[in-house]
Amino acid sequence: MFVQEEKIFAGKVLRLHICASDGAEWLEEATEDTSVEKLKERCLKHCAHGSLEDPKSITHHKLIHAASERVLSDARTILEENIQDQDVLLLIKKRAPSPLPKMADVSAEEKKKQDQKAPDKEAILRATANLPSYNMDRAAVQTNMRDFQTELRKILVSLIEVAQKLLALNPDAVELFKKANAMLDEDEDERVDEAALRQLTEMGFPENRATKALQLNHMSVPQAMEWLIEHAEDPTIDTPLPGQAPPEAEGATAAASEAAAGASATDEEARDELTEIFKKIRRKREFRADARAVISLMEMGFDEKEVIDALRVNNNQQNAACEWLLGDRKPSPEELDKGIDPDSPLFQAILDNPVVQLGLTNPKTLLAFEDMLENPLNSTQWMNDPETGPVMLQISRIFQTLNRT
């Protein structure tokens, strides 16, 4: 019996499920050594009912192994592509590549891009070469534009000095500031959480030390306790914070105040007492660095003095202080207490304003200025106050007017 040679050496016959994109399905038999290209040709003949419509149709289609989602290579055999019996293959037409743009289209697109492109400096100079020039120093104009919040601090420092001199001439100023100072003392007393203070004193810490620790650590008992342990051997641990005085000193101050308020007090004594009140208010404004922030920034390698300066400039904001230390360190700590030039047009315009002149004779205005220096975020509160708001509004208007001119 005669047997063809290709039948003798033929590989294993596989039955494959073929699915076309139009939904047609059929079984195709092929040996393992059949190439993918040959199998694809047979599948296309099946779809075209025995003949190919286009000789290029083979290259325009592809076979995909459904289970692995692989595109089969035309040059490889079914065995090399690891196709198994009863596998499902998808016959799909390849996507036609997008046609290359014509040269005319490319030129039009490039021209459109050039038309939309912003002009460079040379193009601007060429276009404006015939225009008349004006002697305007733009760099100077930009430099003279000042930030209101930055200048406000300088203005407040200078206005505080003027207000103190004006109020020193008021015979009732001493009594007014005594009441205002008493209110400040009450505010400070209210800042100490009695429950937190009791908790620390029950642990055995002295009351004065516990009070100081709570004030330095924002009323946090764990942080205050840690601070007390760390500073137990510190010789200055019993030293009152700025603006505070021991009970004996407070009693002496009260006695002196009562004596000065007597009928026999002279004008000079009243002025001295008012000066002391001003100093006490100023001491309340003295900066107290956040102990936690100081430790954190010093652990980064910064010097303690630099850290305190950074926190003072940035109102105890640790992140802002860190950026200040890493940056150009502007403004400097020395600039914080520096007032505005008394001979400057801005300051003279502020002093000439009737609303400001009237406000400077009000002790509440001075207290507002002091508070805004310590807490810049409180500016909004004082702007809405019926007594201090008009003064702040006039200062802002004068600044904006002169800043534009």
Curated annotation (Swiss-Prot):
Give all residue intervals belonging to the Ubiquitin-like domain.
14-98
- Tell me the ranges covered by the STI1 domain, including all copies: 353-392
Give, as in the UniProt entry, the pathway in which the protein acts: Protein modification; protein ubiquitination
Q: Which GO terms describe its biological process?
A: protein maturation; protein ubiquitination
Basic and acidic residues bias (residue ranges):
108-120
Task: Note the PROSITE patterns from the entry.
Answer: UBA
Q: In which tissues is it expressed?
A: Ubiquitous.
Task: Extract one GO molecular function annotation from the record.
Answer: proteasome binding
Tell me yes or no: is Repeat among this UniProt entry's keywords. yes
InterPro entries under this entry? STI1_HS-bd, UBA, UBA-like_sf, UBA1_UBAC1, UBA2_UBAC1, UBAC1, Ubiquitin-like_domsf
Modified positions (N-acetylmethionine) in chain numbering: M1
Under the heading Pfam families, the entry gives:
UBA_7, UBL_UBAC1
Gene3D superfamilies the record matches = 1.10.260.100, DNA helicase RuvA subunit, C-terminal domain
* Assembly and binders: Component of the KPC complex composed of RNF123/KPC1 and UBAC1/KPC2. Interacts (via ubiquitin-like domain) with RNF123. Interacts (via ubiquitin-like and UBA domains) with the proteasome via its N-terminal domain.
Domains as described in the record: The UBA domains recognize and bind polyubiquitinated proteins.
Name listed for the protein in its UniProt record: Ubiquitin-associated domain-containing protein 1
